[in-house]
């Protein structure tokens, strides 16, 4: 994990993230237009908006995987990212896939596996896991990181109702410890006191730029 001294001092206690007037283009297409938001300890923000509104792009920009064309993303601590890909090596067991994350992180592998009902699968090659089991394994990697800020892009893909409930319990526990998260999802999450941030469709702006 990054040393705390590598991050700026939060402007207020508990602040984990400031996104200030972020604009992103993809080629000639305007994807995000002046997005601003803040995230504090205990927050759970759900990104809403139509398909193509830039929800995944915003998460990638916050994570540092892409740079904004204008504006600024200010993080005050480490983050953990869950993208669309589960990123498991098929020939390695579940335990082997998560070993590096455990080594680099600060949380217990056994605790993460138990919380996500994966303990009985540790010696199974990843190629034999179901899509839901792979998704839970990817989420275990987020838990192992020890980061306070979680960016979760469609975390419930492939999960059944029971697994979504487990995920909700893990997310609630993370918030209770001072963590926070930004989530994109197409299904309701079992979380209380969430905030929503709507990203509008910019299709009309795209037509303007390309005309």
UniProtKB/Swiss-Prot annotation:
Taxonomic classification: Bacteria, Pseudomonadati, Pseudomonadota, Alphaproteobacteria, Acetobacterales
Top-rank EC class of the record's enzyme: translocase
Assembly and oligomerization: The complex is composed of two ATP-binding proteins (CcmA) and two transmembrane proteins (CcmB).
Organism: Gluconobacter oxydans (strain 621H) (Gluconobacter suboxydans)
Similarity remark: Belongs to the ABC transporter superfamily. CcmA exporter (TC 3.A.1.107) family.
UniProt protein name: Cytochrome c biogenesis ATP-binding export protein CcmA
Disulfide bonds: none
GO cellular component: plasma membrane
GO biological process: cytochrome complex assembly
Binding site for ATP: 49-56
């Amino acid at each position: 994990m990054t040393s705390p001294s590598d991050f700026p001092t939060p402007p207020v206690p508990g602040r984990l993230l400031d996104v200030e007037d972020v604009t992103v283009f993809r080629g000639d297409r305007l994807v995000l237009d002046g997005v601003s938001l803040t995230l504090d300890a205990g927050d759970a923000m759900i990104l809403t908006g139509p398909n193509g509104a830039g929800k995944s792009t915003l998460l990638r920009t916050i994570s540092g995987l892409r740079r904004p064309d204008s504006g600024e993303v200010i993080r005050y601590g480490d983050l953990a990212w869950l993208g669309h890909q589960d990123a498991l090596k098929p020939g390695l067991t579940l335990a082997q896939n998560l070993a590096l994350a455990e080594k680099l992180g600060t949380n217990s592998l056994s605790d993460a596996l138990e919380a996500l009902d994966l303990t009985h699968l540790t010696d199974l090659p990843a190629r034999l896991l179901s899509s839901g089991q792979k998704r839970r394994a990817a989420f275990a990697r987020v838990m192992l990181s020890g980061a306070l800020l979680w960016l979760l892009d469609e975390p419930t893909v492939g999960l059944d109702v029971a697994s979504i409930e487990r995920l909700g319990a893990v997310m609630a526990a993370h918030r209770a410890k001072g963590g926070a998260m930004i989530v994109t999802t197409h299904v309701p999450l079992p979380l209380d006191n969430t905030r929503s941030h709507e990203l509008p469709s910019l299709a009309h702006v795209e037509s303007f730029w390309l005309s």
